[in-house]
């Protein structure tokens, strides 16, 4: 299947089962289905107005997705996944561009992504998309109420 037959659309709560199956298929290990990624949590996130989930479909099958969020000053690209059977065809690049546009449409002029150190492929992809690694003594820290959040 060619990239031309792939369509990007905004996902809704109706797409929850397909989305979580894609996350699992793609090996996204940070998914918390009992917490921050539960159906109820996703409903709250989508209703907040600061999160957009975009999906890439081929013939009705969800083969890629990305979450675009913002805090009103900076946009974030999260959870970029492509089904392993459809990788290396430009789909992730298209999803990044679509997420960037969604964030710009909401007024974001800074767009960032956090990339795990054991994912050099993702880092290379974002570099290719024009992102610059910001390595000036910044550390990511978080405080979580539970492992599922």
Give a label for each model feature:
Residues 10-78, 96, 102, 133-137, ...:
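Acetyl-CoA-dependent GNAT
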Residues 86, 90-98:
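Conserved acetyl-CoA pyrophosphate-binding loop and the N-cap/start of the following alpha-helix
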Residues 113-123:
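Conserved beta-strand-loop-alpha-helix junction that forms the acyl-donor binding cleft
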Residues 126-127, 131:
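Conserved active-site tyrosine of GNAT-family acetyltransferases
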